[in-house]
Amino acid sequence: MKTRILIRYGELSTKGRNKKMFTQKLASNIKKSLVDFPQVKVIPDYDFMYLDLHEAPEEAVIEKVKPIFGIQSISPVYIVEKDMEVAKKVVLDLLSQEDLEGKTFKIMTRRSDHTFEMDTNQINLFLGDAVLEAFPDIKVQLKQPDITVRIDVRREHLMVSLKTIQGAGGLPVGTSGRAMLMLSGGIDSPVAGYLAMKRGMEIQCVHFASPPYTSPQALEKTKLLAAKIARFGGSIQFLTVPFSRIQEEIKKSVPEAYLMTIMRRFMLRITDQLRENARALAIANGESVGQVASQTLDSMVAINDVTNTPIIRPVATMDKLDIIKVAEEIDTFELSIQPFEDCCTVFAPPSPKTKPKLEKARQYEARLDVEGLIKEAVEGTVIEEITANYTTPVETASQEIDDLF
């Protein structure tokens, strides 16, 4: 008996003529997530996708593909010949491994081969009677049973499955275009990146580093956050922007109350230039309306003035507790609250303007060599690929020492 993993599509089922493009992208993302299991073969089909395991561990493969967006649900399926006696034996064998006391069940048959000798109702009755005879403790329940035995009659074979595992939903990463995520080391921006990816956006992470004011640990922490969200799409390009000189120049020339506004305007300009270089379509960030001084509507107007590029704000209307809940679900929260200050925190004024005037922001900014500073920062940007398996140099060194002993 051969085992496969069946993947059911989420919103892809509604995509009409574009469905092939969506399924191909999903297949590509799944292959990237299974880099540790090169023997697994991904087989896209119109209604489903299959993974041929070729001796790869079933549970480990399922754990790798569960976070991939575009998947509605996952089921281990057993491929058997088109013989109902064989199918009955497989169903009874599988159920014998379950705790059935006090449980309910139903048989659910899907028949794409309409030439098969039995119709859907006949298959349900045949297998249902066999289960009741073999396991007297179990009862039939057609609505919300504890166990659903799924039978799929295909042209080549029958497929039997007992378990359905919830997938991540959403759209395959990359099907909605590319966006640049402004990734700090905080709680909100990784959640924003996750939610943007869930709507099919491929993201590249832009991080502003200000050594020596910010530590190497702050940078590594942010790379680890990128690795956490890379699980949902395969791999992510991480762009480290040198920002110290810009912050020093701003602090010399701009009134304290406007430091944050001007700094954010520079960040947005630089991200927009990097977006253009990467041929991305939008910028995403973790701004939540009213949460801090730079995230009031007045501040957003003053900061957004520097670009016409669409700004995606996935957490804009979420309460902090709701953002934290998502951060905990995607395993970024504990990392985000590690006490390493980012460039915004280090240079934050004690009383930033919550209602900055656009005219004043432009006036103060005119004191600076805006184009020259942006050009220098963009040219000094370091790009690297971050995967879900990324580890910090400290972790790698520790592992190498452990391996010696």
Features from the language model and the residues they span:
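A conserved beta-strand->alpha-helix junction
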Residues: 226-252, 342
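A short alpha-helix-loop-beta-strand transition element characteristic
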Residues: 331-339
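General small-molecule cofactor/ligand-binding pocket signal
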Residues: 141, 239-241, 312
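Generic beta-strand/beta-sheet core signal
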Residues: 8-10, 163, 206-208, 241-244, ...
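RNA-binding accessory domains that recognize and position tRNA/RNA substrates
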Residues: 1-180, 190-236, 353-361, 367-368, ...
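Conserved G/P- and acidic residue-centered "switch" motifs that form tight phosphate/ATP-binding loops
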Residues: 186
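Small/polar glycine-rich anion-binding or flexible loop at a beta-alpha turn
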Residues: 289-291, 339-347
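Active-site adenylate/phosphate-handling loop in enzymes that bind or generate adenylated species
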Residues: 129-131, 170-176, 247-248, 252-330, ...
